[in-house]
Amino acid sequence: MAALFPPPPGPRFVLRGTQSAVNTLHFCPPSQAAGNPLLFSGSQNGLVHIWSLQTRRIVTTLNGHGGQGVIWLKTLPQGHQLLSQGRDLRLCLWDLEEGRNTIMDSVQLDSVGFCRGSILVRGQQCWMLAVPGKGSDEVQILEMPSKTSVCTLKPEADARPGMPMCLGLWQTNSSLRPLLLAGYEDGSVTLWDISERKVCSQITCHEEPVMGLDFDSQKAKGISGSAGKVLAVWSLDDQQSLQVKKTHELTNPGIAEVTIRPDHKILATAGWDHRIRVFHWRTMKPLAVLAFHSAPVYCVAFAADGLLAAGSKDQRISIWSLYPCP
């Protein structure tokens, strides 16, 4: 019998050459790409590769983490600057202006875990940084680039959520108060008010550690994935209270990352089962299961134009053009 639905298309193209598992991906914003779309990848071998999506080749390799895995990459809005977080307990700030590839500054970190940092831009030249703290359950908040400590967020003694596994800094359109969403080892998601140094709300939506989360501030709705089989969708009401809205059970356990496309139409997950899954964000209707990689998928990222990139333990980066942005 013929299949009812045609299989999803293969990747638009594949990037090879990292020679190591790909832990994290980040598209360069169009405003900084100068007509040459770029993708940043961070690998298990401690290298950051800058790829041209036109030539599909590595343009530059950054080596600043002493062979220790790179787990997070983020560009800053003020010019050609890139943040890279490595398991060498260092967060590097790179100057990429006019072809340079030098480390401008670095922050010494206290946690060697796999929790990626998060930033919140506070002005043209300053931004807030959230990273795992010295205590196993702590999150440290810094004002950058001065590295001034804002606070340390530590759960109540009887809470015991375990280590923070993923972080998301944000603020509402109506308020300049910085907020932090943190996913923890015990399967909980917590909303912190940074100014008050207090927990606004906390929900337990997973039985396993929360491995990734993303938040749509326009809809006041977020999603989290874990080491288990469940994707959880939760919302935030006007009283800053988190509520689980729905859950979606996957075939196989293990979500390494979940990310919502910039236009808030679809989302993608990186699966330990080698699969990339794509969902409609409003309804959570499954749209595609992309079976290309031969090992766990560790990261997914969207470009501003909707292009999807996925990185895997198989050392390949797949680039997909699905449901183009209108």
From Swiss-Prot:
<feature type="repeat" description="WD 4">
    <location>
        <begin position="205"/>
        <end position="244"/>
    </location>
</feature>
<dbReference type="Pfam" id="PF00400">
    <property type="entry name" value="WD40"/>
</dbReference>
<feature type="repeat" description="WD 1">
    <location>
        <begin position="17"/>
        <end position="61"/>
    </location>
</feature>
<keyword id="KW-0539">Nucleus</keyword>
<keyword id="KW-0227">DNA damage</keyword>
<feature type="repeat" description="WD 6">
    <location>
        <begin position="292"/>
        <end position="325"/>
    </location>
</feature>
<dbReference type="GO" id="GO:0006974">
    <property type="term" value="P:DNA damage response"/>
</dbReference>
<keyword id="KW-0853">WD repeat</keyword>
<dbReference type="InterPro" id="IPR015943">
    <property type="entry name" value="WD40/YVTN_repeat-like_dom_sf"/>
</dbReference>
<comment type="function">
    <text>Acts as a critical regulator of DNA damage response (DDR) signaling via specifically regulating phosphatidylinositol 3-kinase-related protein kinase (PIKK) family proteins.</text>
</comment>
<protein>
    <recommendedName>
        <fullName>Guanine nucleotide-binding protein subunit beta-like protein 1</fullName>
    </recommendedName>
</protein>
<dbReference type="InterPro" id="IPR036322">
    <property type="entry name" value="WD40_repeat_dom_sf"/>
</dbReference>
<keyword id="KW-0963">Cytoplasm</keyword>
<dbReference type="InterPro" id="IPR001680">
    <property type="entry name" value="WD40_rpt"/>
</dbReference>
<feature type="repeat" description="WD 5">
    <location>
        <begin position="250"/>
        <end position="291"/>
    </location>
</feature>
<dbReference type="GO" id="GO:0035176">
    <property type="term" value="P:social behavior"/>
</dbReference>
<dbReference type="GO" id="GO:0005634">
    <property type="term" value="C:nucleus"/>
</dbReference>
<dbReference type="GO" id="GO:0000077">
    <property type="term" value="P:DNA damage checkpoint signaling"/>
</dbReference>
<keyword id="KW-0677">Repeat</keyword>
<feature type="repeat" description="WD 3">
    <location>
        <begin position="159"/>
        <end position="202"/>
    </location>
</feature>
<feature type="repeat" description="WD 2">
    <location>
        <begin position="64"/>
        <end position="104"/>
    </location>
</feature>
<dbReference type="InterPro" id="IPR020472">
    <property type="entry name" value="G-protein_beta_WD-40_rep"/>
</dbReference>
<dbReference type="GO" id="GO:0005737">
    <property type="term" value="C:cytoplasm"/>
</dbReference>
